[in-house]
Design a protein with these regions (language model features):
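Flexible, glycine-rich terminal cap/loop adjacent to redox cofactors
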Residues: 5-131
Length: 131
């Protein structure tokens, strides 16, 4: 069940938090966080505050949680709901195709960050994201 907070910025989450995932899966947890500042559509809205975070765990790196903070977070979380229901893996999320420019690209990009291969981050942030 998605959890939504209608504030400015909006906050939405579904599934496990990172802390809950670590309690359940120990060190077998990967996360990817992608800033709205790197999404062209956020710049078009003139609101680059926020991020999308994916939480993956287990031997197959299954998606176990999604957090979205920022503009339209309460709408974007629905993609996370579908991915969780489908038991999507980190690869499935990262290899998905999103329309461009959209805020929804953040989910795919967060998956790519978790895999250490982000597309739309500067080289310095790429190194930090994969560390």
């Amino acid at each position: 069940v998605p959890r939504c907070i209608y504030t400015d910025p909006e906050v939405a989450a579904v599934g496990l938090t990172e802390a809950q995932a670590r309690e359940t899966h120990g060190d077998d947890v990967k996360t990817g966080q992608f800033p709205f500042a790197a999404i062209a559509r956020a710049a078009m809205y003139n609101d680059k505050t926020g991020f999308v975070k994916t939480i993956h765990a287990g031997p197959y790196d299954e998606l176990v949680g999604v957090v979205v903070v920022g503009i339209n977070a309460t709408e974007l979380i629905n993609a996370g709901v579908i991915a969780l229901d489908a038991e999507a893996t980190i690869e499935t999320v990262a290899d998905s195709i999103a329309a461009h420019p959209t805020l929804a690209e953040g989910l795919k990009e967060a998956g790519l960050v978790a895999l250490g291969r982000p597309i739309h981050l500067p080289p310095m942030k790429r190194r930090a994201a994969s560390a």
